[in-house]
Amino acid sequence: MTDPALIDVLVAKQQIADLTAAYCRGVDRADAALLGSLFHPDSHVESGPFNGSGQDFAREICAIVRTVFTQTSHANAHQWVEVDGDSAKGETYVTALATPRGQEGDPVHMLTGGRYLDRFVRTNGTWQFIERRFVCDW
């Protein structure tokens, strides 16, 4: 027999992986509605100069992506997640490529590598970010 608690943890980890992938999609598509839905109403985000709520972050980062870049592409790499009931914490490595607008000739691409340090909460069966902090490693 399979342990139901183990199954719950494995399902939670997959749902959290889907959540972090949806975050990348929301940023890269500048989809503020999608991105905002990934954050708990009481969430907090620290990313670059931004320090505020998840909802405010969703609006601000999508406006930046639409106006400053011709494209962005975030790719999650390995992820560590520790689940504890309806809460979890994790670290996800990410590589992001961005192309600024207004370049002549061969465009310059910005490549960034770092980690997201996250806390997650499950409410009514849905995982959301309660805390997300980006650490730029290079």
For each predicted feature, which ranges?
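Short, surface-exposed beta-strand-loop junctions and turns on beta-sheet-rich folds
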Residues: 96-98, 135-136
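Short beta-strand or tight-loop elements
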Residues: 74-77, 112-116
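A solvent-exposed, acidic/Ser-Thr-rich amphipathic alpha-helical stretch
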Residues: 32-97
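Short, surface-exposed loop/helix-turn segments at secondary-structure junctions
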Residues: 102-110
